[in-house]
Amino acid sequence: DDALSGIGLVQLMEKMGLAFTGADSKFFDPSRQEMKVYAKKANVPAPSWAMVDRVEDVERAAKKLRYPVLVKPPHGYASVGITRKSRCENLEQLKEQVALEINQFGRALLEEFIEGREFTCLIAENPDDPNSPVTFKPVEFIFPEGESFKHYDMKWVEYEKMSVAPVNDKRIEKTLREQTARMFKTMDGNGYARCD
């Protein structure tokens, strides 16, 4: 990794007073745990979850969740740390994946996996009216047979097998735009972002 990328670059540009596009350092990289808390505060539905710091805590945490359970790193970008095996069907698989996440990232987020469609909606700050951020037409990720979520290989290695389509169902589009705007405002969002 480049030593001057991501949050470090944003912080440097802020310190130097340079203009840049995108989020400021307070909004640039919220943890998955922070996003779960904000989702609840914004009344945006999200899967049940638990954060664990030790493999010994997995069994207790898993009792509050329904399988399958998805294991993710505490921070998220580019599906790093998420593999096909991140979707766990039982406690044995869950402990194995959590051990890998904790070894690599220090903690692990466990969340109930919801079988279904996957969408993303882009949003940008509105300089004329901060209370009305601008949402863009949502898109749906369409997975090939045998795949049920976007993991690192699906996103970066086998991306040609996945397709993206605009959301044409007006009801779904409206819901996605409204939920994205609520999250952005609740998080005091700025610049631009996306909500999956």
Protein language model regions, located:
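Generic secondary-structure signature for well-ordered alpha-helical cores
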Residues: 44, 103-106, 143, 185-189
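Phosphate-binding site of ATP-dependent enzymes
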Residues: 90-178
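Peripheral (often C-terminal) accessory segments that flank ATP-dependent C-N-forming ligase machineries
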Residues: 59, 166-167, 174, 186-189
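Conserved metal-phosphate-binding beta-hairpin within the catalytic cores
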Residues: 112, 123, 184-196
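A short, GP-enriched loop/loop-strand-helix hinge that lies immediately N-terminal to
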Residues: 1-31, 45-48
